A protein has these predicted regions:
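Class I SAM-dependent transferase core
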Residues: 1-37
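Conserved SAM/SAH cofactor-binding pocket of Class I
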Residues: 31-107
Length: 107
């Protein structure tokens, strides 16, 4: 049986409560975006992750960039899983999980 988690260098992503699992595409995309934002000359203090799922992309960005991240997830079980993953990481002070529908979220 496959593991219900992915172990990264600085954090672990559990995914047993999420419909959308960690994939190679997600890891590659997260790495690309985190590097692009980290290497940008733009001053970026806040980021928004809509449909955070496990929290993977927020975690990948948090480890590369010193910014605050709001991560929105509509599914209660996935939001709970993301919260667990974030709290267990060294980046919990940089990421805020919000369980709501992004279509009604007040930006």
């Amino acid at each position: 049986m496959a593991n219900s988690y992915f172990q990264f260098k600085q954090f672990t992503v559990h995914q047993d409560k999420c419909a959308m699992k960690v994939t190679t595409d997600g890891c590659l995309f997260g790495g690309f975006v985190a590097n692009a934002i980290s290497n940008s000359e733009l001053v970026i203090n806040n980021c928004l992750d809509i449909g955070t799922g496990t929290g993977l992309l927020s975690l990948m960005l948090a480890q590369k960039k010193n910014c605050f991240i709001d991560a929105i997830e509509i599914d209660a079980a996935a939001a709970e899983q993301a919260t667990t993953n974030i709290v267990a990481s060294p980046f919990s002070d940089k990421i805020n999980i919000i369980q709501t529908d992004a279509r009604i979220f007040l930006f």
